[in-house]
Design a protein with these regions (language model features):
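Positively charged n-region of N-terminal signal peptides that target proteins for export
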Residues: 1-4
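Bacterial N-terminal signal peptides
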Residues: 7-20
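N-terminal helix-cap/turn-to-beta initiation motif at the start of protein domains
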Residues: 20-36
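Contiguous, well-ordered beta-strand patches that form the walls/edges
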Residues: 37-48, 61-133
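Short Gly/aromatic-enriched secondary-structure transition segments
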Residues: 50-53
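C-terminal partner/receptor-binding element of secreted or periplasmic proteins
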Residues: 135-148
Length: 148
């Protein structure tokens, strides 16, 4: 019995150490899959045209599709920094009208909800430091639900 308790304690400790040491790969793994925009605000105003768009992460790539899924709106690579507070994400556009531009943002998870705030489309604006898109900020705040 004491051996079982020792093994269980060891497993719990090992799990905690793995989670505590979770770095960029773990953050990237959590993002993987598709997310549907459920709410959006840009520069202090509702951004209803964004609601319904689907953001998909595959490996180190991202893709944003139109509401009906027929059009790729943006695509490129992304990188995260879990050590930044709040955690940061950069979307590097590799095709389309924003090719060569990098949107700098922040992100957070709450269960199957992903919240991002970034400086798209005005890349001259600074990376957001809070989850808000106040008038004049040039920031866009989007809430996503994990797609089934």
């Amino acid at each position: 019995m004491q051996r079982l308790i020792s093994v269980m304690c060891g497993l719990i400790l090992a799990t905690g150490l793995v989670l505590a040491g979770a770095g960029p790969a773990a953050a990237q793994a959590t993002l993987q899959g598709s997310w549907t925009a459920t709410k959006a605000e840009h520069d202090g105003k509702p951004a209803d045209d964004v609601v319904g768009h689907r953001l998909t992460f595959t490996g180190d790539r991202f893709e944003i599709r139109s509401k009906d899924g027929s059009t790729v709106v943006y695509t490129g690579t992304f990188r995260t920094d879990q050590n930044a507070k709040p955690a940061s994400i950069d979307f590097v556009n590799t095709e389309g009208t924003d090719k060569g531009k990098t949107w700098r943002g922040i992100y957070a998870f709450d269960g199957d909800t992903l919240t991002t705030c970034d400086n798209a489309p005005d890349v001259a604006k600074a990376r957001p430091t809070a989850f808000e898109a106040k008038s004049g900020s040039g920031h866009i705040l989007v809430t996503f639900a994990r797609a089934p």
